[in-house]
Amino acid sequence: MPPTFVLASASPARKRLLEMAGISPLVAVSHFDESSLAADNTVALVEALAKAKAGTVASKFADALVLGCDSLLLVNGQTYGKPESPAVAIARWQTMRGQVGELYTGHALIDRTQNRCLCQTGLTKVHFADVDDDTIQAYVGSGEPLQCAGAFALEGKGGMLINKLDGCSSNVIGLSLPILRSLLQRLGYSLKDFW
């Protein structure tokens, strides 16, 4: 029997993705202070954050498989997480519109039964629509972008503001299902173990 699958995230979108893929996770929020970490580049930062979140939660379980994730958006050399306020979200959208961003999601999967941790980062290019200020104001006013890395939710209203994606769509939502499958297989698990 496989270990309990634990999602070290408060993200409803990540939980929903797992459930749609047939995995019913136990949710254990890490409450890790993301501002306590810094890194030289976006990939290193999302992996460090994912690993820290997974590690914080994994320490509470003796025999679980713990997944931590973190996403950041890189546009024109600037890295963005969740916007701190509506004003920041509006300014960010005014910068992002008509641009192509790179959405990075770090994944850390800790197997407490094997004392192993695997990390991998997904990259998806996001082509933002050249939306007008009224649309930006309305979108930010909906509240949706305030809880999302990059100030948009692909699976919500924000999906209407994206022209196209190059890469994995679930990565943009916060958890690349292909990466998760690969990490599980590298640890010796089959997908059917969790269905």
UniProtKB/Swiss-Prot annotation:
EC number from the UniProt entry: 3.6.1.9
Domain of life: Bacteria
PANTHER family, per the entry: BIFUNCTIONAL DTTP/UTP PYROPHOSPHATASE/METHYLTRANSFERASE PROTEIN-RELATED, BIFUNCTIONAL DTTP_UTP PYROPHOSPHATASE_METHYLTRANSFERASE PROTEIN-RELATED
Protein name: Nucleoside triphosphate pyrophosphatase
Keywords: Cytoplasm, Hydrolase, Nucleotide metabolism
Family note: Belongs to the Maf family.
Cofactor: a divalent metal cation
Compartment list: Cytoplasm
Catalysed reaction equations from the record: a ribonucleoside 5'-triphosphate + H2O = a ribonucleoside 5'-phosphate + diphosphate + H(+); a 2'-deoxyribonucleoside 5'-triphosphate + H2O = a 2'-deoxyribonucleoside 5'-phosphate + diphosphate + H(+)
Record organism: Synechocystis sp. (strain ATCC 27184 / PCC 6803 / Kazusa)
Disulfide linkage: none
GO-annotated molecular function: nucleoside triphosphate diphosphatase activity
One of the record's GO cellular component terms: cytoplasm
Gene Ontology BP, a term: nucleotide metabolic process
Function summary: Nucleoside triphosphate pyrophosphatase. May have a dual role in cell division arrest and in preventing the incorporation of modified nucleotides into cellular nucleic acids.
InterPro entries: ITPase-like_fam (IPR029001), Maf-like (IPR003697)
Active site: D70
